[in-house]
């Protein structure tokens, strides 16, 4: 077994698991994936041994435990600098960190009303006004980055931590049929066409269990 492990939850529903998993994949580290449910007492007890916060994702590398998604990304950038998880330019790097932080701490209306559900396709879904404000801000971020750094990813020709942070939003937009500009839709298509995202989506679609409360429209 690899000395590096990443603890995650459902690939269909867990957006934070997707973010952490993408970051580790992009870093090039060889790792073992541990998937645990988070909705039972036994599962939470098991998860506590792997993640002090009892949250996913949680990375264990060379006896070091890192359990916050942004912290995982920063740690990976330090131990795998050749992966270029952050832009090399100082100004671009600051911009990348800023929009990663905005995703990490914001957009609560989007999270609550459009939960990630990769297997679902919600036709005619009505987006609430507060969630639409989040969508508008996210697409503004994307358009600014794509215009400034020329794509196809948010900071140019290579995926960075920013793309990992916003990948679950891509999946949400596709699930709920969110109306997007051609540039933003092209970005979504670029993300889901990457080998790592194809791998994740295939695994998500193969998951046997559905969480009933996440299978309804809000």
Regions found by a protein language model. Name each.
Residues 1-128:
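GST-like domain detector, emphasizing the conserved glutathione-binding G-site
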Residues 103, 107-195:
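GST-like fold's C-terminal all-alpha helical module
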Residues 49, 193, 202:
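Phosphate-coordinating loops and pocket residues in cytosolic domains that bind phosphorylated ligands
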Residues 15-16, 21, 67, 86, ...:
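Tryptophan-centric aromatic hotspots in well-structured domains and transmembrane helices
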Residues 42-44, 192, 210-211:
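Short Asp/Glu-rich motifs
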Residues 37-39, 187, 205:
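Conserved beta-strand edge residues that scaffold enzyme active sites
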Residues 204-218:
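Acidic/histidine-enriched, glycine/proline-rich intrinsically disordered or flexible terminal extensions
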């Amino acid at each position: 077994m690899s000395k590096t492990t990443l603890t995650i939850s459902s690939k269909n529903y867990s957006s934070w698991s997707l973010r952490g998993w993408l970051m580790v994949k992009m870093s090039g580290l060889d790792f073992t994936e541990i998937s645990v449910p988070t909705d039972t007492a036994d599962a939470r007890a098991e998860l506590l041994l792997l993640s002090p916060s009892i949250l996913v994702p949680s990375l264990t590398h060379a006896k070091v435990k890192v359990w916050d998604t942004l912290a995982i990304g920063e740690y990976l950038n330090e131990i795998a600098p050749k992966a270029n998880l952050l832009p090399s330019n100082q100004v671009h790097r600051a911009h990348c960190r800023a929009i990663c932080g905005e995703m990490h701490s914001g957009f609560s209306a989007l999270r609550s009303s459009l939960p990630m559900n990769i297997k679902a396709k919600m036709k005619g879904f009505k987006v609430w006004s507060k969630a639409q404000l989040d969508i508008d801000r996210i697409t503004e971020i994307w358009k600014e980055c794509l215009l400034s750094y020329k794509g196809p990813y948010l900071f140019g020709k290579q995926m960075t931590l920013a793309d990992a942070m916003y990948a679950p939003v891509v999946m949400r937009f596709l699930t709920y049929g969110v109306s997007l500009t051609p540039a933003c839709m092209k970005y979504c298509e670029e993300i889901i066409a990457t080998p790592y995202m194809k791998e994740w989506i295939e695994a998500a679609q193969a998951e046997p269990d559905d969480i009933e409360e996440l299978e309804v429209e809000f």
